[in-house]
A protein has these predicted regions:
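Active-site-proximal helix/loop segments of hydrolytic enzymes
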Residues: 1-177
């Protein structure tokens, strides 16, 4: 059963999104689906990201690092406060638990990219990794899927098309199976 962590266009802090999936819905898999944006209006293509266990500042590409930094800052923009007691030790322990589900995340990400092939342009043909805060739920298979660049007029047209949305959703669903 798939469930949404939100039903409209409003902000939910990154940690709360994970809590909703894990504790309200007892999810085994967490997929954060986005439409990307870039200053360069010719940027295009879908991407799939998994967590990097090498630390918040490391990533498999410059693009992955920049995207993770931007996504992780969304809590600051959304007004979420850093929780009391956040420290390096908690992050290290969480990273250790997350490592167990990373292989499954990478496998599932490759499956999704395979199903996107022919459906949409791929920005990256392999699963990228970076320190996305939204993916740091210990023990949960998790991915961030960028469905394309809404800042690109051609992709915006596709991303707002209901049939294309259904096709992307089906590709993600089949990639999970």
């Amino acid at each position: 059963t798939a469930v949404l962590t939100r039903t409209g266009d409003y902000f939910i802090p990154l940690q709360e999104r994970r809590r909703i999936a894990r504790y309200q819905h007892k999810a085994d898999i967490f997929i954060s689906v986005h439409a990307d944006a870039a200053e360069n209006r010719s940027a295009k293509g879908a991407s799939v990201f998994a967590l990097s266990l090498k630390g918040a500042g490391t990533a498999t590409s410059r693009f992955a690092r920049m995207l993770a930094e931007r996504e992780n800052r969304s809590d600051l923009i959304g007004g979420a406060a850093i929780e009391a007691g956040d420290d390096t030790l908690r992050n290290v322990l969480a990273d250790m638990v997350v490592a167990g589900s990373l292989d499954h995340s990478l496998h599932m990400g490759r499956n999704i990219l395979d199903r996107f092939t022919g459906l949409t342009h791929l920005h990256s043909k392999h699963v990228e990794q970076a320190g996305f805060a939204v993916l740091k739920e210990p023990g949960m298979v998790s991915l961030l899927v960028e469905t394309g660049f809404i800042s690109n007029p051609e992709e915006e047209e596709k991303l707002t098309d209901k049939q294309h949305q259904r096709d992307l959703a089906k590709a993600i669903f089949e990639g999970v199976l």
